[in-house]
Swiss-Prot record:
Keywords: Disulfide bond, Glycoprotein, Immunoglobulin domain, Membrane, Receptor, Repeat, Signal-anchor, Transmembrane, Transmembrane helix. GO terms for molecular function: signaling receptor activity. Residues 1-29 are cytoplasmic. It is found in: Membrane. This is Cell surface glycoprotein CD200 receptor 1-B. InterPro entries: CD200R, Ig-like_dom, Ig-like_dom_sf, Ig-like_fold, Ig_sub, Ig_sub2, Ig_V-set. SUPFAM superfamilies: Immunoglobulin. The chain crosses the membrane at residues 30-47. The gene is CD200R1B. Disulfide bonds join 62-130, 165-214. GO terms for cellular component: external side of plasma membrane. Residues 144-228 form the Ig-like C2-type domain.
Length: 243
């Protein structure tokens, strides 16, 4: 059966018998068509959940396949538009559609098809798909990216001389504990911008002469600080300021 250029790429599912013919059609098609369309998937793996710290870089890799003819990265953020990177190996040609300059190949795509995001932001959260084409068909690998934000923390004395520890995060919420152990229950307040502030007020009956110590636990940071409210001495945790 004769395969037209349009049917060969846009509509015909890839199969071991027709893959070479489909790739021949791709070579004669504009890069905009390559970037905005998707071939059928012959093989797939599960979703890998990855996380990156806000403002840092992160890398996602493609599945290891031999005799690759084309590689495509498709980015579907929770907010904003889809963007696509593509590389046609036979022609040593790359294409890019709607992607930020921060999102690009980690190195030369002819020998490293990994995707790198520089200065990761909250808007980068979402699904990332690498599609690889070779003589056996099309294969893809899925990632779900979560962006972590380090807590903003403060340790201070309230108007009654009680130690108060605060930690503000986007997600997940930080955990706060005290030494000596306090019988107070931390309060978590959610805000419209997606952040969560956890507040804990030290309420132990006795400290045995020791300064209360606040312990903040989070995926991106673990900090321990002490404070002496009997003399109203202020101690701060890095990244925060007391009111």
């Amino acid at each position: 059966m004769e395969i037209s250029q349009q049917a060969g790429w846009c509509k015909k599912p890839a199969s071991p018998m027709n893959t070479r013919a489909a790739l021949e059609a791709v070579r004669n098609t504009a890069w905009t068509i390559v970037l905005l369309t998707s071939a059928a998937v012959m093989g797939a793996s599960g979703i890998s959940r990855v996380s990156a710290n806000l403002g840092h870089s992160t890398v996602m890799t493609c599945p290891n396949r031999t005799n690759i003819s084309m590689v495509t990265w498709k980015i579907n953020p929770k907010t904003g538009h889809q963007c696509t990177l593509a590389y046609l190996i036979d022609k040593d040609s790359t294409g890019k559609n709607s992607c930020s300059d921060r999102i690009n190949w980690r190195s030369r795509p002819d020998w490293d098809q990994a995707l790198e995001i520089q200065q990761v932001g909250k808007a980068d959260e979402g699904n990332y798909t690498c599609e690889v084409v070779n003589a056996d068909g099309n294969f893809h690998y899925l990632y779900h990216l979560t962006v972590l934000v380090a807590p903003r923390m403060a340790l201070y004395c309230d108007d009654h001389g009680n130690p108060v520890c605060e930690a503000e995060t986007v997600k997940p919420a930080a955990e706060i504990s005290w030494v000596p152990e306090s019988n107070s229950t931390p309060r978590a307040d959610s805000h419209g911008n997606g952040t969560v502030t956890v507040v804990s007020r030290f309420a132990a009956r006795s400290t045995n002469g020791k300064n209360p110590t606040c312990i903040v636990s989070h995926a991106t940071l673990n900090e321990t600080r002490s404070i002496n409210c009997s003399s109203r001495t202020l101690a701060q945790l890095p990244g925060g300021s007391a009111p």
